[in-house]
Amino acid sequence: MFVNFKTQFNMKKLLPILLFIIGLCTPLTAQWTSPGNGTTFTFADLVEVTDGVVTIGENGYVVNADLTISTGDVLEINNQTARVDFAEVLVTINGSMFCTNTSTRTRFYGLNETNHFSMRFENAIACNLKKMYFSDGAGIKVIESDVTFDDVKFVYFTRDYSTGVIDIFNCDPVIKNCYFMLNDGPAISSPANGQASPQILNCDFDTNVKDINSPQINLGPGSDDTIRIVGNEIYTIYAQWYVGGVSVADLMGIGSTKVLLKDNIIRDGRYGYNQQGMTISSVIEGNQFLDNFHEDNPMNGGSGISIYGTSTNNKAILRNNLITGNLWGITAIYQHDIDMGTEDDWGRNEIHDNSNGGVTYDLYNNSACDLMAVGNQWGTANAEEIESHIVHKNDDPSLGLVTFYPYIGSESLAESTIDHGQIDLSSATVFTITGQRVRPESLKPGLYIVVTPTGAKKILIP
């Protein structure tokens, strides 16, 4: 076979030149940063000015490289922005981003199964994301920014960029009317070394957190404002076994955290609400904590409500909650200041049928601190049965006393005045009006509850 070595040699020299020319003819996509001169950009505008960072693709707009909206500039999402696909890029908002959608839900997608885009709001102002849909993201960080998410859906997020779908640092974003489903990490999180008080209102949290021991809402210390978690439904339906509902923790003693947990339904998780650490004051009102038993070992979880204090500055007021079907109803651990109802302000919590190992544990005061729990409904009017469902000083002298009398149903108990010797107490169980069990032979003048095999009544010993 004849070979022209001269031609072969010339092709070897020509090939690098051809590749260089092809490279020059192929558009290179680098990141783009807006000028910071007060300009408002739509995605249609970005196609014109970003030199290929934003283009028009098969389904709508495509973001091919990192994009930054500088301080002073605005990214506007309008009805003409139906869909945006993202490569594995970071979109940073240092200026502002707002949506004017009225009829169309703008959808942000990862470009394919391996591309997970990220967003970062840092020192951003007046951001309002409304009527949007985010899918296949790697996380959204909100850092010292003013951001509202309203009627936004978040699905299939990984944990590649942030721990939660929305990670919050040193700010108080509003997250309302939103839906979080099947994301790998918590829906909303904030760190232990920052302060954030998100306003989480009327949202649905559906089976978030995959293969990690974490709640769907996982918050560190609050800022000056109150953390408000109001009107949400938090649940798991796809057998995500070790997923808790809500946790608020101040493990480093940062600031003074205030929490309003109100009118939520928290069900079918590893636990309902966990409050842990140093200085936290919460009002827990009107919630339903249902069937939170997804824990193999009851020693590791399963409470409807758990208050774990490292000081008595860990405080909670509980009113009008329904707590049933959990491994433990309420657990109070170490140090705390818990008010479940007083004689002047009844708790009116409904607490019953919380059990594990064949034993009912509606309230476990695993602490030396006393606990007021007056005016609650325990699923029975039998004081002895209520007592058997509460673990406290009567069971272990090292524990604090739980005062549960009067309770809802005790009003119907007959009351009589007797002298010593007028009633046979040999087969009776006697409680003080604070719910403390006492020996019948040591009764002093006062009002008592006497429980016998045939019923219960109040007795007054003059």
Residue ranges and their predicted role:
Residues T71, K444-P445:
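Surface-exposed loops/turns
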Residues V438-P440:
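C-terminal trimerization/auto-chaperone modules of long, extracellular attachment fibers and adhesins
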Residues M1-W32, E415:
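Bacterial Sec-dependent N-terminal signal peptides
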Residues V374, I433, P453:
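Short, ordered coil/turn segments that flank beta-strands lining enzyme active or ligand-binding pockets
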Residues Q31-D370, G375-E411:
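Beta-strand/loop edge motif enriched in small/polar residues
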Residues S410-Q436:
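Residue-level detector of functionally pivotal "anchor" positions at catalytic/ligand-binding pockets or at interdomain
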Residues M1-Q8, K13, P445-P462:
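C-terminal tail/sorting-segment detector
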